[in-house]
């Protein structure tokens, strides 16, 4: 909240996370005397007498946010990782795809534009730094996988799966008796030093979409 006010001004309200619904709508309505409102894990809400006025507010506040990030961005801390050779990448992706496809065939795509992020010393913090929105969590999971060239993938992926099971079951216990829910515990995205970001999905379209979503959330975590 402090950062929001510092970046956008005190006339922009901040609302802690609420699930979408009537209560959240009521809270936003109570902020009508403010210039705009930022909803935690949802985004920016603006208004005006015309759609153009509301749109211009959005552009204005986005520029303020970008300027704040630019002025407060930490220096990128890259490692000495070099881009892997084609044969090294192919072998790694074959191991990765094989492990992810044990229950259902997966397609894997690579986003080389995230190579600088994957090569940073704090890559673990970037991968586990949280998602930008709840939709991102639903699409690509809570955390990204981090995997190295020499990894056989099996142990790394199994440890991530077990951790996600524990995380999921902790909240499943709070649901009504008899409630059942199945969830895909496979990592959907990950950062690979020397390669970039991988995205996995049952189709090439889904795999590419996952890397695009991951780019937003990884860049956000890197700028914190």
Language-model features, listed with the residues they occupy:
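Glycine-rich flexible loops
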Residues: 1-224
């Amino acid at each position: 909240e402090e950062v929001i006010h510092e970046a956008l001004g005190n006339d922009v309200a901040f609302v802690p996370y609420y699930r979408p619904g009537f209560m959240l709508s009521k809270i936003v309505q109570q902020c009508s005397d403010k210039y705009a409102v930022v909803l935690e894990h949802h985004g920016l809400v603006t208004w005006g007498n015309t759609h153009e006025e509301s749109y211009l507010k959005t552009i204005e506040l986005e520029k303020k946010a970008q300027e704040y990030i630019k002025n407060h961005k930490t220096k990128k801390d890259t490692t000495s990782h070099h881009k892997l050779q084609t044969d090294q990448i192919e072998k790694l992706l074959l191991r990765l795809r094989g492990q992810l496809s044990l229950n259902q065939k997966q397609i894997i795509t690579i986003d080389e534009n995230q190579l600088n992020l994957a090569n940073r010393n704090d890559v673990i913090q970037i991968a586990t730094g949280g998602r930008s929105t709840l939709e991102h969590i639903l699409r690509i999971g809570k955390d990204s996988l981090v995997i190295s060239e020499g990894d056989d993938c099996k142990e790394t992926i199994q440890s991530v799966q077990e951790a996600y099971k524990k995380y999921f079951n902790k909240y499943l216990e709070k649901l009504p008796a008899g409630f059942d829910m199945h969830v895909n515990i496979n990592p959907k995205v990950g950062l690979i030093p020397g390669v970039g970001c991988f995205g996995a999905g049952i189709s090439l379209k889904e795999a590419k979409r996952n890397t695009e979503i991951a780019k937003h959330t990884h860049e956000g975590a890197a700028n914190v």
